[in-house]
């Protein structure tokens, strides 16, 4: 489920989503899983969500270092959040989220060598995963015929929904052609999701903005990013 490559345009629009789905999960599978997962990911900025994030970070941090490697994050997404109920492409999604959070954290802290995620970046990583999952649900509603591919008319019909999500489009045809990177005349989920996440970040800023980053830092020990006790957050 990477950011490049389209499904071969010769693949017929045959309603495959109702049978096996874009990644082995059906639309019904994802809908059921999403209702649980959207509540399980503590991405909001309120005190309760932050407290849940602290506990979740500790559960992910099996080595007790205050820093998460990719394997710890992936294992936690499987065993604790059980995100594989939604998709069979979880490693790819988590890798993207991990890299995004890590890179932003290194930029904020003025370092660029660590291949780790600390508590400061943890919320951003969760937000990115949430966004990809939410985009999958949106794509399911846009893909009216269940072909796993979007045509221009389906994209145009979904403009109000995309605006609600945070992406306002004025020239649908031009944007559709930009998303369709291989010129096949249809858009795959990979093309759509990579475009939508990037566009949302350009318009609204990273899901974990600078103000929130500072607040999250209050919940971590300076220097090592280990979550402090809940009362000190």
Swiss-Prot record:
Ca(2+) 2 binds at residues 143, 145, 147, 154. Residues 214-225 have a biased composition (Low complexity). Ca(2+) 1 binds at residues 61, 63, 65, 67, 72. It is found in: Cell projection, Cilium, Flagellum. Ca(2+) 3 binds at residues 180, 182, 184, 191. Residues 1-11 have a biased composition (Polar residues). Transmembrane segments: none annotated. Residues 1-29, 203-233 are annotated as: Disordered. SMART domains: EFh. Residues 20-29 have a biased composition (Basic and acidic residues). PROSITE patterns: EF_HAND_1, EF_HAND_2. Pfam families: EF-hand_7 (PF13499), FCaBP_EF-hand (PF22592). Signal peptide: none annotated. GO terms for molecular function: calcium ion binding. The keyword Metal-binding applies. One of its GO terms (cellular component) is cilium. Residues 48-83, 130-165, 167-202 form the EF-hand domain. Keywords: Calcium, Cell projection, Cilium, Flagellum, Metal-binding, Repeat. One of its GO terms (biological process) is calcium ion transport. This protein has four EF-hand domains, three of which may be functional calcium-binding sites. May contribute to the rapid motility of the trypanosomes, playing a role either in flagellar structure or in calcium metabolism. Could alternate between a GDP-bound inactive form to a calcium/GTP-bound active form. This is Flagellar calcium-binding protein TB-17. It comes from Trypanosoma brucei brucei.
């Amino acid at each position: 489920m990477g950011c490049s490559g389209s499904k071969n345009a010769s693949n017929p629009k045959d309603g495959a989503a109702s049978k096996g789905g874009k990644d082995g999960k059906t639309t019904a599978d994802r809908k059921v899983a999403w209702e649980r997962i959207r509540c399980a990911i503590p991405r909001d900025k309120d005190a309760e969500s932050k407290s849940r994030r602290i506990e979740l970070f500790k559960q992910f941090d099996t080595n007790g270092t205050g820093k998460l490697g990719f394997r710890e994050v992936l294992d936690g997404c499987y065993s604790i959040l059980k995100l594989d109920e939604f998709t069979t492409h979880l490693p790819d999604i988590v890798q993207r989220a991990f890299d995004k959070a890590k890179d932003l954290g290194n930029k904020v802290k003025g370092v660029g060598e660590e291949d780790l995620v600390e508590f400061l970046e943890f919320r951003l990583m969760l937000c990115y995963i949430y966004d990809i999952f939410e985009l999958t649900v949106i794509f399911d509603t846009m893909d009216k015929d269940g072909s796993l591919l979007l045509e221009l008319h389906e994209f145009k019909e979904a403009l109000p929904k995309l605006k609600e999500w945070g992406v306002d489009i004025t020239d649908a045809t031009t944007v559709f052609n930009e998303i369709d990177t291989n010129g096949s005349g249809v858009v795959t989920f990979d093309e759509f999701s990579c475009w939508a996440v990037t566009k949302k970040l350009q318009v609204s800023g990273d899901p974990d903005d600078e103000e929130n980053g500072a607040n999250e830092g209050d919940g971590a020990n300076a220097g090592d990013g280990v979550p402090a006790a809940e009362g000190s957050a």
